[in-house]
Amino acid sequence: MSFTKIDHYEKEYADTHHDTALNVTQGVEEQPIVSPYFKRRKKRALSTGEYVEGILAGNITILSQAITLVESANPDHYAQAQEIIEACLPHAGKSVRIGITGVPGAGKSTFIEAIGNMVAGLRHKLAVLAIDPSSERSGGSILGDKTRMESICNNPSVFVRPSPSAGSLGGVARKTRETIVLCEAAGFDVIFIETVGVGQSETAVHSMVDLFMLLQISGAGDELQGIKRGIMEMADLMVITEADGENIHKAELAQTQFQGALRLFPVPESGWRPKVYTSSAVTRTGLEEVWKGVEEYLDHIQKNGYFQHNRNRQNKYWMYESINEALRGSFYRDPAVEARIGEYEKRVLEDKISSFIAAKELLEIYFKDTRTLE
């Protein structure tokens, strides 16, 4: 019998036996994952008053929701976010703001977890704003600090909030300044701001904190190489981390080297000579000394008036930054600019027009359009 005849008989058999298990191809009817009787209830949006009331009461869930609203890029959220910030402002400003940065591998998260638990044990309420790097290629963010700081996240006196940097210079989240206000209004009296690493970016963090702490690891070759002078000049306090085991001697040597280097810098405007400490998050040694150094610095600048002077200067700086950000956003959202900017970009890439002339003409388009809208 030929294969053709076999195929014919198999087809004929299949056509006349529809109920055989071998011929069932679709299986039983798939049941819905969610019951058809279940009605998804839409979450009711909180009013500005409810947000503010919850924040002032120290409600962490509402605080987190408010921060998400402030960080949102949705224009519809902007007005309410600003109302919340404005209502919280009279209750803010009473915390100590500490910026913490360091070279890659300096163990910032480990150090923050160790000293953070210690600070919380001193009856402080601590907020940790861990600013994660956003990828320049994909715009994604690691947001991994909560996994690296497991024990501190379970401390009832500590609030950890990782925020994407949104590609901004230095890894500072676009709305970190407003987040600080909300955390202070919620009753947190110590705020740590962890940055992504050493670079130009740290200038932004320095402009929103009372104390700038620089972490450095020892035993990485020439201790003074790989760290920019500008970052060292901004530091009010330096910590050599991982000073334990066989690394203790290297840490002490690094401490001496950095202390000597810092003496060569001019005395800062605060009148404070930065100090260098060693610590170990593993053995918990040196943490109390570091915190004592923080308290000494804060006492010094409060007595000589630099504390308030610095905050006033920071407020002025952020006023201008807010203006710049608002103008930049208005420019790129303008319909006339959106319609022409691609054309100008192409002409610049083809060397048909200089970048300066392109910018000038795009600004003229923007101003003409805004005047027309008026």
Spans of features found by a protein language model:
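Nucleotide-state-sensitive switch-loop elements of NTP-binding domains
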Residues: 47-58, 63-101, 106, 110-201, ...
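Alpha-helical scaffold elements adjacent to nucleotide-binding pockets in ATP/GTP-utilizing enzyme cores
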Residues: 142, 179, 204, 208, ...
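Short hinge/gating elements
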Residues: 48-53, 106, 239-244, 275-280, ...
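Canonical P-loop GTPase G-domain recognition
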Residues: 237, 243-303
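Flexible active-site lid/hinge loop adjacent to a nucleotide/diphosphate
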Residues: 220-249
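Short beta-strand/turn micro-motifs at beta-sheet edges
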Residues: 147-148, 224-229, 264-268
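Non-catalytic terminal/linker segments enriched in charged/polar, low-complexity residues
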Residues: 1-90, 338, 342, 359, ...
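Long, well-ordered amphipathic alpha-helical subdomains in the mid-to-C-terminal portions
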Residues: 63-65, 278, 289-367
